[in-house]
């Protein structure tokens, strides 16, 4: 019985975004291609050709082009993907040939079989290149973080370094792009100019973790009419860098803020008149859950987010595949890979000629000098 291929939750999300961004403006059910795309992470070299051929065959069977205007619209979307194709000559040969076919309607109609074959090849070229690049970076990240050949102290240090590196990536790169703020250039007064990409990422990791960007983002969303009260995910993910106090201390203040009404000041009630018992319990439950995560009582790693999978813009913040394309997901994966490499270099043990001593600690060993 063949061993089951390893799967990656991160790559499942990334691959779906890539497929949907490439196939935008094309009338095709992308579910089959998405399922094939997921197989390219941790995929043996012997199977990659079969998976990519499956993607091409699906395109060949399902893609239809009705007129040259539709083709031009598709090409406008595909043009930006040229940066992620390893052989740009291949890309531009196919792309420019398709452009030529839009010269006249008669020429387009006569050559439609050739147009479809060329377009299917171009789409497969883009998808396979982007997916393989993404798979390679995700595999590197996961293997680096999951490596078993590390001491517990090194593993702990690397996980924490990576956690806060990703928080800085969100705070100093992604959130400013979402709200249109200037992106802060990493680096400090008196340091040498940044000479390479790794140094830029290193300085990004050194920037202060506590910033006002999350609150600024909430203000931006509130001005756009989006409800920002569902922020438990930001606490759990570590973006909301604040201490969570006892529920009893702040519950009245939280509820009065949400209600946006005057509090009845009497001996019997400190809650707003238009807040019912059910709403009070929901607020209490939300803060209790946040407190449990903050104190480590719950360590399942689950994070529910207001960012995806919801129907109403007034309650949640929808991020589509086209938005992910705008945020250049492969570039961010590359930044994460460089971060992981920098963290690895920083925490790698160096042979100092000492003696390994076993102790009764969860960390198990320490290094001592030879005496």
Curated annotation (Swiss-Prot):
Please state, per the UniProt record, what induces or represses the expression of this protein. Answer: Expressed in the late phase of the viral replicative cycle.
Alphabetic keyword roster: Host cytoplasm, Phosphoprotein, Virion
Is-annotated flag, keyword Cell membrane? Answer: no
Q: How does it assemble?
A: Part of a complex composed of A30, G7, F10 kinase, A15, D2, D3, and J1.
Naming one, the record's GO cellular component terms include: host cell cytoplasm
Which InterPro entries is this protein grouped with? Poxvirus_G7 (IPR008787)
Determine the domain of life of the protein's source.
Answer: Viruses
Q: How is it modified after translation?
A: Phosphorylated on serines by F10 kinase, phosphorylation state is regulated by H1 phosphatase. Undergoes proteolytic processing during morphogenesis, probably required for the transformation of immature virions (IV) into mature virions (MV).
A Pfam family annotated for this chain is Pox_G7
Protein function = Late protein which is a part of a large complex required for early virion morphogenesis. This complex participates in the formation of virosomes and the incorporation of virosomal contents into nascent immature virions.
Decide whether keyword Phosphoprotein is in the record.
Answer: yes
| Protein family (similarity comment) | Belongs to the chordopoxvirinae G7 family.
Cellular location of this protein?
Answer: Host cytoplasm; Virion
The entry's protein name is: Assembly protein G7
Residues in coiled coil: none
Kindly list the residues the record flags as site (Cleavage): 187-188, 238-239
